Amino acid sequence: MRFKLILFLFAVTSVLAAASPEGIPRELARERAGRISNVRYQLQFTLVPHAPSVSGHEELRFSLNSAGTVLLDFREGSAAKLTVNGTAAPANIENGHITLPGSSLHTGENLVSMDFTAPVAPAGKAITRFEDKDDNSEYIYTLFVPMDADMAFPCFDQPDLKGRFRLELTAPATWTVISNTAAESDLRIGPGQRHTFFSETQPISTYLFAFAAGPFRKVHETPGLPGLYVRQSKFQRAEAEAPEVQEITSQGIKYLAEFFAQPFPFPKYDMVMLPGFAYGGMEHAGATFLREESILFRTAPTHSDLLNRDILLLHELTHQWFGDFTTMRWFDDLWLKEGFAQYMAYETLASLKPSENIWKRFYQAIKPAAYGIDSTKGTTPIYQDIPNLKDAKSAYGAIVYSKAPGILKQLAFVLGADNFREGLRLYLKGHAYANAEWSDLVHAFEHVSGKSLDPWASMWIRHRGMPQVQVEWSCDGQDHINHFSLSQHDVLGEGGVWPIAMQLRLSYPTGAPVAVQAQLDAEKADVKEALGKPCPQYVFANDQDYAYGRFLLDSRSRAAVMELLGSVADIFQRTLLWGSLWDSVREAELAPRDFLGLALRLVPAEQDEALAQNLIAHVITGLHRYVNTNTRTAIVPTAEALAADQMMHSPQQDLRIIWFRALRGVAENSAARVQLKGLLSGQASVPGVELRPLDRWSMVTAILALNDPEADSVYAAEQKRDSTGDGQKYAYVAAAARPTAAAKKQYFDDYVSNPARPEDWVEQSLATFNYWNESDLTLPYLKPALDALPQVKRQRKIFFGLAWLNAFIGGQQSPAALALVQEFLRIAPLDKDLRLKILEVSDELERTVKIRQRYP
């Protein structure tokens, strides 16, 4: 222990000796957190329309328990008139830090004052400007997660130095301004200007501080319901959606306050819909920002789309407790907030809408995404070591958003619902408006349950990868089970053995299935509880989806399931079985053409819209990635005809919508393209469905990518029809699919050289640039895209880098592309996080090549 302390002190000394380390190293953060407390920010921003920057003034108060130099974080702006406890100091910015001289600081409270400017841009900055082309209005908003607050104002930009914020904003008088707290007062200060004062916040981390400004309108203002704001050009659209959005949020507040035994922790709760917002939502304390398109659908929505919106709203709402009220100490515990927010969103919706079979939807939305990453060489543990916050962006992805909630469902099954809830209550109560780590939550669960969770946490939280669970069983001559065993192996071959609690399902032709509880803590275990039971038709090892891992059907069960799947009445079980069959395709154990044949035969009768949508997505993936050209050419006409027929004749509107999407996805031949053009021209329509702008532009994209003879005229007609701001974005996205070398060059140059292009325009166009049938055209851009990855990491928001890789690597299917990626990994000097992301994304390309070689 003494040796570790010496090492830590040496590391801290080294950080201080290097006056301005790059980013925010863990050692610097620990040193500051150990010395600094009682942080208070008083911030004034002046927002000027169309200006490339904002000006501001800051008064920062904090207490020190030991004197000496302090580093303040600030980058990409300028500072002036810096005083420290009344003494002038140099306002130099070096490597993203301002040095506060130790000679001017003292133990106890200190006061730092300065003027500053910070950049504003359409993309790539902490303060974003959006110009609404529909009415020429302007909106400015902030987005600081994980460590971009220091691009907006000087601060201690680490999650465990919480501060109280008092904000003042000067903006045009016609603008509405929203922040974490309510406005206390405002003052007219000149022609057309208003100065607004906001009340002081409770202690929050810098990444949770926020403001938005512009001609927003408050939608459906109703006492007792959360506030909802939208840009003025979308007010009418928002009015129609607002009651459902506000009502589910209001119900969620009541449910979560009772579940956590903790009232809503902030004075008010507003939601602000923002155009071009980089994420689905961001949970600023008391003021969640939402991507406008996630709330106001640009396509005809299905019932699943509406439920997914509920999940988004409840996810961000849960963060007000799990993330804002109690915050992880460092971003290596990012999963602690994201995993719980995702899990609790489903837990809450399952209680608010008990008829919706929410845990089936949890499986569909969560588990495949998690398994798809966790089986790759680029996966990470849930707990991710992040030595420097500059690398925190790479921690975001399916591991924290999908594996973490999947593991939490397993933990709730292990502990029991009551212990799980009581543990969360104890954890939140003990860390109110403070910071905590995973170990704190483990101790809370252990306290209420009396169970030791160290072995469980060691494998599930600290170890990467996942188990594959296999079942072996046999029956005697009297048709009773005489042998039943479970075994597991690490899918990465790294020797992991996980503690797994699961429920087995023994299914029979007649009569109810039998559920058997089982525990697998070693490489192999016999299940004595199954012995002597009647011989089942098939066995599935993860009934109700309590466990986490790959659960493939044994050969006997798989053969039975493929014969009887259409008659499985339990929709949750039917969904799980389809998922297991698809996993068998991805593991090259089941020929993709066999899966496609089964799916195309059974999906027309599938009345569960969410499952039908999954199956259609698998069919499209199978056609575009896993089968060879001859097989695809043979199957596509059947798929096109089926989609066209079901689009017109399915009894449910939701099904007609997903079959319309299916036709757009599988369309390849002339007849299908004619049908799409008929929908665009108005010569045809989907019964009962009003196609929305993005529906139409998606059809235009397909027609362009398929090089239809009328593509140019179709594109021009839609541009004329939809000249809105959104229409201009969709036109940009669609044109990226043009199958010409000139178009690809123009777009790629724009991606890497035009910082003014809004980030959501670029991100949405990446998939159309890499359309499934254009891999020969886009292969020359694979290496340049990989070369640009460090630039993307530096300049773009959290999820953009993953979208970049998924598009450019995911757009390829050939051994040549795989070889190029592997050679790049061999020779490129990459940061560890970027190397892992490439390994993660290239796994699908590797699988594609393997499947095509196995089933030529």
Model-derived features: where do they sit?
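Hydrophobic alpha-helical and helix-loop surface patches within well-folded domains
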Residues: R2, E31, F198, L228-G493, ...
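Bacterial N-terminal signal peptides
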Residues: I6-S14
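N-terminal, polar/Ser/Thr-rich
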Residues: A17-S55, D134-Y139, P159, L453-S458
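Surface-exposed beta-strand/loop patches in extracellular or lumenal glycoproteins
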Residues: H57-E76, D157, R166-P172, S439, ...
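A surface-exposed beta-strand-loop module
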Residues: F74-K133, G190-R194, K524-C535
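Beta-strand-rich binding/interaction modules
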Residues: S78-V84, L453-D454, R464-N542
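Extended, low-hydrophobicity, Ser/Thr/Pro/Gly-biased non-transmembrane segments
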Residues: D115-H220, P243, Y548, D570-G579
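Long, ordered, helix-rich scaffold segments
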Residues: I481, E494-G496, P509, K528-P856
